[in-house]
Amino acid sequence: MQKLALGIEYDGSWYCGWQRQRDAPSIQSYIENAIKKITSESVTVFCAGRTDSGVHALGQVVHFETYSRRSKSAWTLGMNRYLPSSICVRWARLVNKDFHARFSAISRRYCYIINNNCIRSALLFRKTWHYKKYLDINKMCDAAQYLLGENDFSSFRAAGCQSYSARRKLYHIRIIRKGQCIVIDIKANSFMYRMVRNIVGSLVKVGCGEQPEKWIAELLENCNRSLAGVTAPASGLYLVEVKYPSDFSIPSSFIEELWCA
């Protein structure tokens, strides 16, 4: 038996999320069914990040074990043949037995896109958060600096989060404007349930002028979710990259080509 890692891209608009559910379409179930079609094996696929309903991915990483031996191209082409157009396998790699898509990861990176325009977009409404009021990204950038480093992110922790600790380490948070869209690029060692969306919701309150930049620092100190901003919609969130130790030879994401400066 061998262990295989896959790089997955998907439009999460049409799914209940990553995790398999009995009565709703999930990314996991489609991936597992495609594997079964080409190997005749029933496998369980493990992912780096269990994305919510409506959340997208450019750099999801998964792994599974199989007896089937195929070339890298045979895996990608074979699986994509049986996957819907909204899910795609971008690469396949054999990995050693110690690799785990979730527990071997050393960092995760998300991008959140806000369509900051008074007119909504018919094409972008499932891919962004349409926010009409003008957002000052300079204020948002200044506020975001308070989040860097290791902190207790309890104020950005959603109800139902099962993480033992709310301490996380943010490596970077960058905010840029691309035409009518604002891209919030955030990287950390790991994230709690809906943490990115809760951070975005709070930064938007700063950007629209409802709160001063230092309010973000106060939220960190208070450790109280009820004081922070709303949870931003799932539609604007993208899992773009998962990093691993170099000895696993996992390909990097291509996100720089798309949005980030």
From Swiss-Prot:
Indicate the family of this protein.
Belongs to the tRNA pseudouridine synthase TruA family.
Q: Where does substrate bind?
A: Y110
> Known NCBIfam families for this protein?
hisT_truA
The answer, when asked if Isomerase is one of the entry's keywords, is: yes
The answer to whether the entry has keyword RNA-binding is no
Name the residues annotated as catalytic in the UniProt entry. Answer: D52
Per the UniProt record, the source organism is Blochmanniella pennsylvanica (strain BPEN)
Q: What is this protein called?
A: tRNA pseudouridine synthase A
